[in-house]
Amino acid sequence: MDWKEVLRRRLATPNTCPNKKKSEQELKDEEMDLFTKYYSEWKGGRKNTNEFYKTIPRFYYRLPAEDEVLLQKLREESRAVFLQRKSRELLDNEELQNLWFLLDKHQTPPMIGEEAMINYENFLKVGEKAGAKCKQFFTAKVFAKLLHTDSYGRISIMQFFNYVMRKVWLHQTRIGLSLYDVAGQGYLRESDLENYILELIPTLPQLDGLEKSFYSFYVCTAVRKFFFFLDPLRTGKIKIQDILACSFLDDLLELRDEELSKESQETNWFSAPSALRVYGQYLNLDKDHNGMLSKEELSRYGTATMTNVFLDRVFQECLTYDGEMDYKTYLDFVLALENRKEPAALQYIFKLLDIENKGYLNVFSLNYFFRAIQELMKIHGQDPVSFQDVKDEIFDMVKPKDPLKISLQDLINSNQGDTVTTILIDLNGFWTYENREALVANDSENSADLDDT
């Protein structure tokens, strides 16, 4: 066969015929079929050669997309059923009363004052009679955990019952919070926690006096405390476990007590007086009534002695709208200044002081902020204090690992972070620190005068 015949046959093949040229979609489909075929063969071969692949757990479960409505509904329904089942496993009020009756019946003499006690033998007897739901509480580990210094080897019935009550409450609360966990990943987003607190308000007698028009501001005030302290990386979500582990939820649910003292309400961030105080301060600062705070308006916060340099940094680093601060950003500012001993608050202020974004404060940073304090002292007719003296005092207080740099961890470890930050940002705070000995002496004299009378 000569080359002309070979060429003629080649040109006549269906693959090269213009009329039968494959479309782009057909080529993609063919490529996908081949990929699937070879991938399946390879996967099958690997599975047969290595049995360990059967025991490796699955690490990733894809969440349903927004357009996969059926999968979303199925996931929500299955989670609801699971949480209902978990809820039924908890002790109800009647079962708790029965447990208390059994414990009281099996107490082991002698009593210590009015404290009823129980030994391990009777402890196990109560566990057998209390039912399957209580089995998890009647273990040697729990008994040993509550065993202290009793010479008869007993534990307090009241302490054990409180332990059970606390465990039941934690599980109930976990289930309640999980109902708002839309993604089912063990986290609550800001909107999830807002919904939880909004639906919780009617169950808290101490909040009965709040007008419904204030609910949105109250919810914002409450939620910000959770996120400010529990979400330091600002991911927009916090673990349900972290919510349960901290005291904030206890403070919030304390508002169920109808006889809560005035002092307790004043120190509780979640109380109605506290929320109204914070919101009232915001309204008082907002002189132009546009719902936002400018730098000039914020400068009147507290004793109105914060430096302009510090306020400049606040508006440079914090989220603002056309150069003004909204209520949510203001709440972070208040939480930081009112809790300066806390690591989360120090992290907030440290970021503002770290003007070079180096992760530490050096002599330049300290001098940059203290110069503004010196200027305010001149304006108020006070003699400026030498920066060198203040700088030496700060480094002596903090005792950083590096003698020329102060890190955030150095501030936290020193337990002097609140004092150091106050010295650098607030004239009134610096004056209080500078005259601390005179103030202590004055307090002592006043105390002595009161004792004499």
From Swiss-Prot:
The keyword Cytoplasm applies. GO terms for molecular function: metal ion binding. Ca(2+) binds at residues 286, 288, 290, 292, 297. Keywords: Calcium, Cone-rod dystrophy, Cytoplasm, Deafness, Disease variant, Metal-binding, Nucleus, Repeat. Ubiquitously expressed in brain and other tissues. GO terms for cellular component: actin cytoskeleton; centrosome; cilium; cytosol; Golgi apparatus; nuclear body; nucleoplasm. Residues 273-308, 341-376 form the EF-hand domain. Disulfide bonds: none annotated. Interacts with MCM3AP/GANP. Interacts with PPP5C, and the phosphatase 2A core enzyme composed of the PPP2CA catalytic subunit and the constant regulatory subunit PPP2R1A. Finds in a complex with ABCB1, TFPI2 and PPP2R3C; leading to the dephosphorylation of ABCB1. It is found in: Nucleus; Cytoplasm. This is Serine/threonine-protein phosphatase 2A regulatory subunit B'' subunit gamma. GO terms for biological process: B cell homeostasis; cortical cytoskeleton organization; microtubule cytoskeleton organization; positive regulation of B cell differentiation; regulation of antimicrobial humoral response; regulation of dephosphorylation; regulation of mitochondrial depolarization; spleen development. It is linked to Myoectodermal gonadal dysgenesis syndrome: An autosomal recessive disorder characterized by 46,XY complete gonadal dysgenesis and extragonadal anomalies, including typical facial gestalt, low birth weight, myopathy, rod and cone dystrophy, anal atresia, omphalocele, sensorineural hearing loss, dry and scaly skin, skeletal abnormalities, renal agenesis and neuromotor delay. Spermatogenic failure 36: An autosomal dominant infertility disorder due to teratozoospermia, with spermatozoa showing anomalies of the head, acrosome, and nucleus. May regulate MCM3AP phosphorylation through phosphatase recruitment. May act as a negative regulator of ABCB1 expression and function through the dephosphorylation of ABCB1 by TFPI2/PPP2R3C complex. May play a role in the activation-induced cell death of B-cells.
